[in-house]
Amino acid sequence: MSEFYIGVMSGTSLDGIDLALCEIEDDAFELLLCASYPFDAELKSDILNAINAQTTLKNIGEIDIRLGKMYADALEKFIEENSLKRVKIRAIGLHGQTLWHEPESQNPFSMQLGNANILTARLGICVVSDFRQKDIALGGQGAPFTPAFHEFLFSKLSGNVAVLNIGGMANITLLREMLSGYDTGCGNVLMDYWISKYNGSPYDKDGEWAKSGTPNRELLREFLKEPYFLKSPPKSTGRELFGEKWLKKQLSEFAKKNQNCSYLKARDIQATLLELSVQSIANEIKKSDTTLLIVCGGGINNRYLMERLQEELGDIKIASSDEYGVSSEFMEAMAFAWLAHERIHKKCVKISSVSGALRDSILGAIYE
């Protein structure tokens, strides 16, 4: 019997809350409705301050509650606007907002905020959340999890297929006999930060500002020396590495080595950041035997980024997931609806070959 699930996703970019109502029955999956709701600007600022260690334990606790309320508000609007009956929704899959992700420390952890109890109390609907904790407890990275969903969607395609998600971070999935996938590094996050700092825009529409600049190859080489790019998978990352602090440090060190770098304009740095995303993605795709690259995530709307990626990848075919009947914009929200379904039905998610965990496991905690 088919069931209805709502996936909730707010990513590294902090640019909105994506909701996806999906109908799922065994191997059948359909996106029925989807919508995006704005992310509270003050809450976004407080989250970024917390990531940059400008916070207190009290603030972190309050952010957890405020996020829960914001998710509940968005869900209530979604349900009301679409005249949905709450009793027919089997569960909500809530990723939460990642505050810090450190799976390789002595005491590995991944912290997602957004109190699931608030959602169940307000909506009267079962919520599945805390997806990453079990995988980390089993020695895994706890990320990325979308490769398992990509395999569910695209495993029947012929050829050597890869799936690329470009959000705040970028991650790839290699659909081979043994599933693999990992974060390649930054996607939109540094470009979004830089244009917001200089132009006040939340993102670089079509990559126009980056295109107006000239990439600095020497600066790009310095960026690409980041040890994360040299690390072999399994690996995952986030704002705790590729954020404001990282970029400021890189630019400061570059300025010290190149005393006369006043010629480097803000738009040139934006162009270099776009090239960083392109090169760090392309370098990984080129290592594989990929013939078809399916792209999803907000980065697909950056026209110049996609043009540069195609130039770098040459004969490899690049296609939007929309061409295969899967929403490129709501892929991650759909993934968490699917993960909620897997948890409700006590199915192991086959992700250990991606995360490096000791074994596959049932992921997520149920809040009722």
From Swiss-Prot:
Give all cystine bridges in this chain: none
What function does this protein fulfil?
Catalyzes the specific phosphorylation of 1,6-anhydro-N-acetylmuramic acid (anhMurNAc) with the simultaneous cleavage of the 1,6-anhydro ring, generating MurNAc-6-P. Is required for the utilization of anhMurNAc either imported from the medium or derived from its own cell wall murein, and thus plays a role in cell wall recycling.
The residues the record assigns to binding ATP are G11, T12, S13, L14, D15, G16, I17, D18
**GO MF annotations, alphabetized:** ATP binding; kinase activity; phosphotransferase activity, alcohol group as acceptor
Q: What is this protein called?
A: Anhydro-N-acetylmuramic acid kinase
Q: For this protein, what reaction is catalysed? A: 1,6-anhydro-N-acetyl-beta-muramate + ATP + H2O = N-acetyl-D-muramate 6-phosphate + ADP + H(+)
The entry's family comment says: Belongs to the anhydro-N-acetylmuramic acid kinase family.
Quote the gene name from the UniProt entry.
anmK
Which InterPro entries does this chain map to? Anhydro_N_Ac-Mur_kinase, ATPase_NBD
UniProt-listed HAMAP family: AnhMurNAc_kinase
Question: What EC number(s) does this enzyme carry?
Answer: 2.7.1.170
